[in-house]
């Protein structure tokens, strides 16, 4: 442990002004993009009534979590880098900032897992999804996620998995020690388990969609009919379906007596269901991109944490650790870009709202009432 601290001090002493400038510039850019981007998406989701439904409630919650982390936690990291990787705000402030950072991380992980489950329900069990996933259900899920996140982030405040200022990371977070005297390993294992479970749910969803798209050979069975209705044993039911859709002529088939013929609405309902299915797939693709980017940007930092817990010999290289920490910071500002570039509906609503705000109002003509 002493060797680790001594090596870290040597790395910090060799920190060049150029490195500090790059850190401050990149972190300032991340703060601005994250706060502005997530705030714009939040305003759009709250203002447009067509987006007041299940998947976008969760997206609004994710945006609020990223705004919380970017607006409160990142400025303290900025000041830490500016002051030469030192903390000048006291132990209690360090614990509060670390609590908020870990809270946001676990909240995003839990919420992405819940979103993956709802995405599977939206495609595999669409009728159940549309009936049960109401506003109050989404609110209950959001409250549950925040409760679980607080339960995960609060114990270190009471020195169970101690929060402290890590100079190599320029932030207050978990103090990762060797696994023999470590009490933060359980938190990291749970986070990795949540990310793995989220990927498995999306993998199951991909298999479900692939199985439904797989074309199977048609097995023709001979059907017998005297009046071209083709009902009874051996019939595929297509003639009856055509008659119900309004394309049948002649008398009613015997098996369809008492059923009213519908000429127009059946085709419309089928097209509406197909459009909804495609829309749900696009939304699922957007949330999977968010999940994949979360895993990609947080992955190197998790590797560095496990390295410090289990490795006995060499410490984590300073360049790798800095890049991993800043990649985890960048995750807070990546979701607005994913929303705009991968969701056609959000892009259309955003352009409509922007054009409406920029539209100049014509002056009123003077008139008189006769």
Swiss-Prot record:
Transmembrane segments: 26-46, 58-78, 97-117, 138-158, 189-209, 287-307, 314-334
Membrane side Cytoplasmic: residue ranges: 47-57, 118-137, 210-286, 335-370
Membrane topology: Multi-pass membrane protein
Annotated glycosylation sites: 3, 83, 182
Recorded GO CC terms: endoplasmic reticulum; plasma membrane
Disulfide bond entries: 94-172
Segments on the Extracellular side according to the record's topology features: 1-25, 79-96, 159-188, 308-313
Alphabetical keyword list: Cell membrane, Disulfide bond, Endoplasmic reticulum, G-protein coupled receptor, Glycoprotein, Membrane, Receptor, Transducer, Transmembrane, Transmembrane helix
Compartments in which it is found: Cell membrane; Endoplasmic reticulum
Predominant subcellular localization, coarse grouping: membrane
One Gene Ontology term of the molecular function aspect: G protein-coupled receptor activity
Similarity comment text for this entry: Belongs to the G-protein coupled receptor 1 family.
Function field: Orphan receptor.
Subunit structure: Interacts with DLG4 and DLG3.
Record-given protein name: Probable G-protein coupled receptor 85
Source species of the chain: Pongo abelii
